[in-house]
């Protein structure tokens, strides 16, 4: 209420965020948490909090992940299993940070970015998240189109499957109209399909479990060349997706948590962590199934080896995909499915296609939710869901359709590898905000990260940044056109500037709000956002008015000079 004229003041973006309102349809759906006096672990509470972590884990199981898994197994056998394990573990650590931010504040990360960052870097962050979401959507379009092609025995061409993905996505997006728990149950059903289908391939011809265990536990990189390093970075990029951090911080808002009680917040943080760990353990096992099957079945094999298997079963796809030569097999989602059909029988091909279809559909929906959170938070712009998904899918479908119609499926290999690398490059724009917000006592209060958590989080960031630097150097060495190289140089100069900005902001967030770093004129003028400047202006105002009379509400207000009045809100 405006104190000067008694009229209602317009609701600002900051006020709307503080009121934890949201225009997102998904966040209007809430799950109640049972209020129990029981001390200790509660299965009922775990069940109430189960959902957001499994929706988040979908990003660890999209078609881009599956392709990275099968290529890693086929090319390098069991050597990169440890990369998958540690990528999943690091994913859990950073997802934990984003979930804590949403749980403690009642705001998702994109909303907090609106008040914490300056407009120019904030817009750049939004653009990079849109690039990541669209890149992920392209992988889902490709995977779904290939699965439709395989399930239809080639009757629906891949470019036709690309077009179909627009319609089926719009159909699935209305599922939350039936209730949040049913939506989460549907996602669990899709994950179960992936576990059954990929698990079937794994147990049908069980690989050497000792080698699997060694690959997970013992880090090794025999004959480590740039291709193997790129594959390892691709696995990291396919597991830890930048937009997934923003998604997870929003999904946890679907639980009714009493934020006036520290115990309720602590319980929510604990159960969300347990649920996320369970969900990512399931995703790790599914990815391990795929890696193991192709490490056991395809590593060291040539095209003619696989072609002979296909000819023995009279498989119609084999001759078109595997040439009569002694080159090592270069496998993708389609040729991987065909190999399974030739190796295990036709049923294995269709089972594989169903698993890929489930991966593509589930990832599409979570990508849409992430896009809604990004627009709502970064821009204060809200679209209804069907407009949002059409926007993302329309952009993603153009290059996918072009490649599918005018080229062959092998062209998707290079595109998918590029997209996985793209995800990895965008990671600093999600990891640094997650570290900053979860460590800032001004935002999360007493629940801020401790010293060890801050150090581990920063080490994760520098590890990701170093891996990206290697990837960029290798990528730029392969570019021959000077004008393309010039554009990339310009982009990476901007990229580096924004990373430095985010790092400076993060360093300020790691310190006390009243520290000299936060009070520095350069930081306040160029780095820190509106929320911190408002914080200091408010504290400076109170410090200068402590000796003046303080009034809450009085009819005698006119008797006191205006300059001596301080309202307490």
What are the residue ranges of the model-derived segments?
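C-terminal membrane-solvent junction of multi-pass transporters and transport-like membrane proteins
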Residues: 186, 373, 383-394, 412-495, ...
């Amino acid at each position: 209420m405006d104190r000067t004229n008694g009229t209602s003041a317009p609701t600002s973006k900051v006020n709307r965020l503080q009121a934890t309102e949201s225009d997102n349809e998904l966040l209007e759906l809430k799950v109640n948490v049972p209020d129990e006096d029981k001390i200790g672990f509660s299965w009922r509470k775990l069940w109430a909090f189960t959902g957001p972590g499994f929706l988040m884990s979908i990003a660890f199981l999209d078609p881009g992940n599956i392709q990275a898994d099968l290529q890693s197994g086929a090319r390098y056998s069991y050597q990169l299993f440890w990369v998958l394990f540690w990528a999943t573990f690091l994913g859990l650590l950073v997802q934990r940070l984003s979930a804590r931010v949403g749980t403690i504040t009642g705001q998702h990360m994109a909303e907090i970015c609106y008040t914490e960052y300056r407009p120019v870097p904030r817009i750049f962050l939004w653009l990079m998240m849109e690039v990541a979401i669209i890149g992920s959507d392209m992988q889902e379009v490709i995977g779904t189109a290939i699965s439709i092609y395989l399930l239809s025995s080639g009757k629906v061409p891949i470019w036709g499957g690309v077009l179909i993905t627009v319609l089926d996505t719009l159909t699935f997006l209305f599922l939350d109209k039936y209730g949040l728990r049913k939506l989460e149950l549907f996602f669990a059903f899709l994950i179960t399909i992936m576990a059954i289908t990929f698990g079937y391939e794994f147990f049908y011809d069980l690989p050497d479990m000792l080698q699997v265990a060694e690959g997970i536990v013992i880090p090794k990189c025999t004959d480590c060349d740039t291709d193997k390093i790129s594959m390892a970075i691709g696995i990291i990029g396919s597991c830890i997706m930048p937009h997934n951090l923003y998604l997870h911080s929003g999904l946890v808002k679907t639980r009714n948590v009493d934020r006036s009680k520290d115990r309720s917040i602590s319980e929510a943080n604990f159960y969300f962590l347990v649920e996320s760990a369970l969900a990512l353990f399931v995703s790790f096992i599914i990815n391990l199934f795929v890696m193991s099957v192709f490490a056991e079945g395809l590593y060291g094999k040539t095209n003619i080896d696989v072609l002979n298997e296909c000819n023995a079963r009279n498989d119609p796809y084999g001759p078109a995909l595997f040439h009569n030569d002694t080159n090592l097999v270069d496998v993708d989602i389609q040729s991987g499915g065909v190999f399974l059909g030739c190796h295990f029988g036709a049923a294995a091909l269709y089972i594989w296609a169903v698993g890929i279809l489930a991966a593509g559909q589930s990832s599409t929906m979570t990508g849409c939710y992430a896009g809604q959170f990004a627009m709502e938070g970064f821009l204060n712009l809200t679209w209804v869901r069907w407009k949002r998904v059409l926007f993302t899918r329309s952009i993603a479908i153009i290059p996918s359709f072009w490649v599918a119609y005018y080229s062959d499926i092998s062209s998707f290999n290079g595109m998918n590898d590029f997209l996985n690398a793209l995800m990895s490059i965008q990671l600093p724009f999600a990891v640094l905000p997650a570290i900053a917000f979860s460590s800032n006592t001004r935002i999360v209060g007493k629940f801020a990260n401790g010293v060890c958590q801050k150090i581990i989080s920063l080490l994760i960031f520098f590890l990701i940044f170093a891996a990206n630097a290697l990837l960029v150097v290798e990528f730029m060495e392969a570019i021959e056109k000077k004008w393309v190289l010039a554009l990339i140089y310009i982009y990476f100069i901007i990229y580096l500037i924004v990373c430095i900005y985010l790092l400076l902001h993060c360093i300020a967030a790691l310190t006390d709000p009243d520290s000299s770093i936060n009070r520095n004129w350069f930081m306040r003028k160029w780095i820190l956002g509106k929320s911190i400047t408002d914080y200091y202006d408010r504290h400076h105002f109170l410090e200068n008015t402590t000796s003046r009379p303080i009034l809450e509400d009085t009819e005698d207000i006119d008797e006191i000079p205006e300059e001596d009045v301080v309202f307490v809100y």
